[in-house]
Regions:
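Histidine/cysteine-enriched polar flanking segments
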Residues: 1-200
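Cellulosome-associated attachment modules in secreted, modular CAZymes
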Residues: 197-258
Length: 259
C-alpha cells in the first residue's frame, strides 16, 4: 500500500484510478499513459501500471475507496447490492473493475484473486465503504458505521476480513464522523515501516547511522531505535535506567547476531 490512489503489490505493479488524468480534479489532463508509467518506474521502480475507472461522486476518485490489496495476489473490490444502492453508475463501475482485475496479473505475472466486499448504501451524499481499511501488524482496522442489513452488515464484514486474512484480528472503528469528509481509516493514516538497519556498535555518539557524517540524523536514528520505529539489524539498543543512577536515558548499544 502507498496512498489513496496508489496501491502497490510489492512485486512491481501499482493500481491507480483514472482520476489521475482528470483535469477537473486538479490533475494534468495532458498526462499520457506512457508518461505515467515512466514516472512510476523512475520514482517507485514500478514496471506495471494498472488504471481502473473511479467511483462517481465519492469525493476523491481514489482507488482505495473501493479496492484494496491485502497481499501481492489478493484484491478486495467493493460490491453494491443493486443499481440503486450506490450513486448512479457505481454499481456497474465496481463490477467492471472486479472483472478487469480478475483478468490482470501482478508485477510478477501471477493472476489476481478477487474478493468482493459489500459496500453500504450511498446516503445523503456520502459514499460509505468498508474497503478503506488499514493493516497494522497483526490487526486490520476496519471502518464501521452501524449497518446491520442482510447485505451490508458491520459484524459480517469484520468476519469476512478475518476469513480472507487468517491470523489477523479485524477491529471495527466507528467512522461516521469522518466518512462525510470523503474518506475513512486508510485515507487519514500513513505508515512508517519497521525496517532492519545497522548502527555503530558500542557507540552512541558520532556517526551512529554510518552515513559518513555527524548530524541531526544520528540523533534521530537513536530516537527511532528507542521508540521502536525502526528495528536494529546488527545491534540492539537498550533504554531506561541502565546505570542505576536514577536517571532514565538512552542506554548503550550491544552487538548481536541478526535473528
Amino acid at each position: 500500500e502507498a496512498g489513496g490512489n496508489m496501491l502497490l503489490d510489492g512485486q512491481g505493479a501499482v493500481i491507480v484510478s483514472n482520476v489521475i488524468f482528470d483535469g477537473n480534479q486538479g490533475f494534468d489532463p495532458n498526462l499520457t499513459q506512457d508518461q505515467l508509467e515512466q514516472y512510476f518506474l523512475d520514482y517507485f521502480g514500478v514496471h506495471k501500471v494498472i488504471v481502473t475507472p473511479h467511483l462517481i461522486n465519492d469525493g476523491t476518485g481514489h482507488i482505495d475507496m473501493f479496492v484494496k490489496l491485502i497481499n501481492d495476489t489478493t484484491v478486495i473490490v467493493g460490491e453494491y447490492e443493486n443499481q440503486s444502492a450506490g450513486f448512479s453508475g457505481n454499481y456497474d463501475i465496481c463490477n467492471q473493475v472486479a472483472n478487469q482485475l480478475a483478468n490482470e496479473t501482478n508485477g510478477a505475472g501471477r493472476p489476481f484473486n478477487i474478493v468482493r466486499m459489500p459496500m453500504p448504501p450511498y446516503s445523503n451524499g456520502v459514499t460509505y465503504t468498508y474497503v478503506n481499511s488499514l493493516i497494522v501488524n497483526n490487526k486490520v482496522l476496519v471502518p464501521i458505521y452501524g449497518f446491520s442489513t442482510e447485505f451490508a452488515n458491520d459484524d459480517s464484514v469484520l468476519a469476512l476480513y478475518e476469513t480472507i486474512m487468517p491470523g489477523l484480528e479485524a477491529v471495527g472503528f466507528d467512522c461516521n464522523q469522518i466518512i462525510p469528509a470523503n474518506g475513512a481509516i486508510h485515507c487519514i493514516a500513513t505508515k512508517v515501516p519497521a525496517l532492519p538497519e545497522t548502527i555503530a556498535c558500542g557507540n552512541l555518539m558520532g556517526d551512529v547511522n554510518l552515513d559518513g557524517r555527524v548530524n541531526i540524523y544520528d540523533i534521530l536514528k537513536l530516537v527511532y531505535f528507542v521508540t521502536g520505529v525502526i528495528e536494529p539489524e546488527l545491534c540492539a539498543i537498550s533504554s531506561g535506567d541502565m546505570t542505576n543512577d536514577g536517571d532514565i536515558k538512552i542506554g548503550r548499544a550491544s552487538c548481536r547476531e541478526r535473528v
